[in-house]
Amino acid sequence: MTQIIKIDPLNPEIDKIKIAADVIRNGGTVAFPTETVYGLGANAFDGNACLKIFQAKNRPVDNPLIVHIADFNQLFEVAKDIPDKVLEIAQIVWPGPLTFVLKKTERVPKEVTAGLDTVAVRMPAHPIALQLIRESGVPIAAPSANLATRPSPTKAEDVIVDLNGRVDVIIDGGHTFFGVESTIINVTVEPPVLLRPGPFTIEELKKLFGEIVIPEFAQGKKEAEIALAPGMKYKHYAPNTRLLLVENRNIFKDVVSLLSKKYKVALLIPKELSKEFEGLQQIILGSDENLYEVARNLFDSFRELDKLNVDLGIMIGFPERGIGFAIMNRARKASGFSIIKAISDVYKYVNI
């Protein structure tokens, strides 16, 4: 039986937080909000507790977890050999949506790191998350609080749909702020390597680190062979409805015209294009002028698509600047790499 606890995200009630913290300390699982998406947490020092996360999510065990901390003392409990520059940067950017991959200490069990000698760590910028970690007295390992392959949850209702009856506690702390998962960067190598784009942008990373490596899998153009961090290797973020991603905006209208003749479609578009496609089902992602709004609505939109009873979702591409890079990473993966750059690409993915 899952206990659902509603907590004020701005002024978390300590008595309610303590209920969830007791569950963490006793080897249980708690879904909780962060500034990015909801996470499903367990004691990061308890391998058996962390296995419950994988079981609840149907998550492959070779897909590592992010360890969430509330202070720098906890950082040194889970990570070692941290470069001075990385420590300086962490003091600037934390709490915030940036995860570092570092060398792990012996205290971190293999269940958290998928047997690797590295650990992904971040300090979340959310009052409920920070208070939960503090009251638990241990770092909390947590991936997103959804069934594996499904869109990450940005509100408690989505967590309840996926995980009610599968976890001990779900904290309802309202809608998350960013709507996409944290940026992950591997700082055990030089230059650092971007493993997953997120709210902390490439432009911001370059200001802090100088040169960074951006592999193809970080762009969402292919899967990584080994998962050093979440979101690298497996199908992610996907609605159950087939999703096509039209990266070339110049042909979007033609693609929609072609597909809507044979299929029942829903369009995932910015509000600026809404009038142009009147008469077709639409999910408005936000405004072209505010990509943070688009990111915040992205996973909600994928879940909304599944409620519309259509054959296909057709999503338009967005500029890969700022958080747009993370939007396109998630969209490519959600589409199963069904990416349309020319009209001829349509025939690769759909029978016309």
Swiss-Prot record:
What is catalysed by this protein?
Answer: L-threonine + hydrogencarbonate + ATP = L-threonylcarbamoyladenylate + diphosphate + H2O
Question: Which domain of life, per UniProt?
Answer: Archaea
Q: Where does L-threonine bind?
A: T36, H68, R122, A142, S182
InterPro entries, sorted:
DHBP_synth_RibB-like_a/b_dom (IPR017945), Sua5-like_dom (IPR006070), Sua5/YwlC_C (IPR038385), Sua5_C (IPR005145), T(6)A37_SUA5 (IPR010923), TC-AMP_synthase_SUA5 (IPR050156)
Q: Name one GO biological process term.
A: tRNA processing
Binding, ATP: R59, N63, T118, S144, S152, R196, Y237
Q: What is its EC number?
A: 2.7.7.87
- Could you name the Gene Ontology cellular component terms for this entry? cytoplasm
Q: What's in the keyword line of the UniProt record?
A: ATP-binding, Cytoplasm, Nucleotide-binding, Nucleotidyltransferase, Transferase, tRNA processing
Domain YrdC-like, first and last residues per copy: 14-200
Q: Where in the cell is it found?
A: Cytoplasm
Q: What family is this?
A: Belongs to the SUA5 family.
* Name of the protein: Threonylcarbamoyl-AMP synthase
Species annotation: Sulfurisphaera tokodaii (strain DSM 16993 / JCM 10545 / NBRC 100140 / 7)
Q: What is the lineage of its organism?
A: Archaea, Thermoproteota, Thermoprotei, Sulfolobales, Sulfolobaceae
Per the record, the gene is sua5
